[in-house]
């Protein structure tokens, strides 16, 4: 990982060498690095997925938590421009990071066969997500509260990031190097 996120040239070689079944990534404000995959690298990642027929699992819990400028489009959004790439992409999202950690509501957009298996696994693990939590989230979203909530949480996380970076500089100085996050937790 460098300043533009996952190094796709190196990934290409690793895929050839190891032939993975899937590649898991947090391309936007990745944890713990804070790196965001550039637009060019996102496109190349989708192209690699098609070339090697390997599933990309895009975990996108932080995509809406940018501090200033929005990040590049998600792999899911880009897949509309790269025919065939959706067949090799699973996109995971969550309300937990933006609304409430206890809410535990997320989603998966994936190829139909994978989605069917994921639904079965979910049912085996806990039967279903809390109906109350789902209804609460649906009501909140339908009422149009999300933009204000996002603005508030973005401001809080940006302030926390500034405090953390200042503390790292003051306490550790040149002994530590880090990427100044542009979003996320």
Regions found by a protein language model. Name each.
Residues 138, 155-165, 175-185:
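Conserved glycine-rich beta-strand-loop-beta hairpin in the small C-terminal domain of fold type I
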Residues 4-67:
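Active-site phosphate-binding strand-loop segment of PLP-dependent enzymes
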Residues 54, 89, 176:
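Short, conserved active-site loop motifs that form the nucleotide-linked donor/cofactor pocket
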Residues 35-36, 68, 78, 120-121:
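Residue-level signal for well-ordered alpha-helical positions
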Residues 28-31, 62-63, 96-98, 112-115, ...:
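Short, solvent-exposed loop/turn segments at secondary-structure junctions
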Residues 80-155, 162:
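Conserved core segment of the aminotransferase class I/II
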């Amino acid at each position: 990982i460098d300043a533009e996120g996952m190094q796709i040239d190196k990934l290409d070689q690793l895929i050839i060498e190891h032939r993975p079944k899937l590649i898991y990534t947090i391309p936007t404000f990745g944890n713990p690095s804070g790196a965001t995959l550039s637009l060019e690298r996102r496109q190349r990642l989708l192209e690699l997925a098609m070339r090697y027929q390997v599933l990309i699992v895009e975990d996108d819990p932080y995509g809406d938590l940018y501090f200033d400028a929005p990040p590049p489009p998600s792999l899911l959004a880009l897949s509309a421009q790269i025919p065939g790439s959706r067949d090799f992409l699973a996109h995971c999202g969550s309300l937990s990071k933006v609304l409430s950690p206890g809410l535990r509501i997320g989603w998966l957009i994936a190829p139909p066969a994978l989605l069917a298996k994921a639904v079965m696994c979910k049912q085996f693990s806990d039967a279903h997500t809390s109906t109350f939590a789902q209804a609460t989230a649906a009501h909140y979203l339908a009422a149009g509260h999300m933009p204000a909530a996002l603005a508030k949480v973005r401001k809080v996380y940006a302030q926390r990031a500034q405090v953390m970076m200042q503390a790292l500089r003051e306490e550790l100085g040149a002994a530590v190097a880090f990427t100044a996050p542009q979003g996320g937790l």
